[in-house]
């Protein structure tokens, strides 16, 4: 098991209910507890990236990086990301969650919510900077590998992709491991896979992938 030093600056393990829990420093977003020092609990059961940290999956994140986050929803995970990252572009296609994101961003000036479809990066290419250090994708749709390939254009040559693959969003009938293999095969058209690990302890039928662009 990796030591907690693998966590980015701005993410700490602190005591909640006499247990060591992941936290970031910031305002409460989804009803999570917050200690007297301003550190709020990061619930790995509600966040795939949080689950990756709990499972000691090495992401390479150190804190302060520029982020393009696809599938931001109402901000559960991306709010924690913005607590420790640099400029964080949050892409979400549904208007209702974006309204929540705008509220989250009021206390996080580095968080930039965008009402856009991650499958159509041309709709936000004029806003998102190039040479982004991390592309983090958590999109519940078919064609998850295609989304990652289309958004590779924003990554710096030495940037990284963190992809949460949801097997049931691709195919509800096939064995999840077969679905993962198919997606990984497509992903290799534009990425070099560094890590793949299932998240079943926290999220059924999900696979975490860390990759670098194959340029």
Swiss-Prot record:
Q: Where is this region: Disordered?
A: 1-29
Quick one: which residues bind S-adenosyl-L-methionine? 76-77, 92-93, 117-118, 138-141
According to the UniProt entry, its GO molecular function terms are: histone H2AQ104 methyltransferase activity; RNA binding; rRNA methyltransferase activity
Biased composition regions of type Basic and acidic residues, renumbered to the chain: 11-20
- SMART domains reported in the protein's UniProt record: Fibrillarin
What UniProt keywords are attached to this protein's entry? Answer: Methyltransferase, RNA-binding, rRNA processing, Transferase, tRNA processing
Q: Which InterPro entries does the entry link to?
A: Fibrillarin (IPR000692), Fibrillarin_CS (IPR020813), SAM-dependent_MTases_sf (IPR029063)
Q: A biological process (GO) annotation for this entry?
A: tRNA processing
| Superkingdom of the organism of origin | Archaea
Look up the EC number in the record and give it: 2.1.1.-
Q: How does it assemble?
A: Interacts with nop5. Component of box C/D small ribonucleoprotein (sRNP) particles that contain rpl7ae, FlpA and nop5, plus a guide RNA.
Matching PANTHER family: FIBRILLARIN, RRNA 2-O-METHYLTRANSFERASE FIBRILLARIN
Q: What does this protein do?
A: Involved in pre-rRNA and tRNA processing. Utilizes the methyl donor S-adenosyl-L-methionine to catalyze the site-specific 2'-hydroxyl methylation of ribose moieties in rRNA and tRNA. Site specificity is provided by a guide RNA that base pairs with the substrate. Methylation occurs at a characteristic distance from the sequence involved in base pairing with the guide RNA.
Q: Which family does it belong to?
A: Belongs to the methyltransferase superfamily. Fibrillarin family.
HAMAP family documented for this protein:
RNA_methyltransf_FlpA
Protein name according to UniProt = Fibrillarin-like rRNA/tRNA 2'-O-methyltransferase
Q: Which organism is it from?
A: Haloquadratum walsbyi (strain DSM 16790 / HBSQ001)
Provide the gene name from the record: flpA
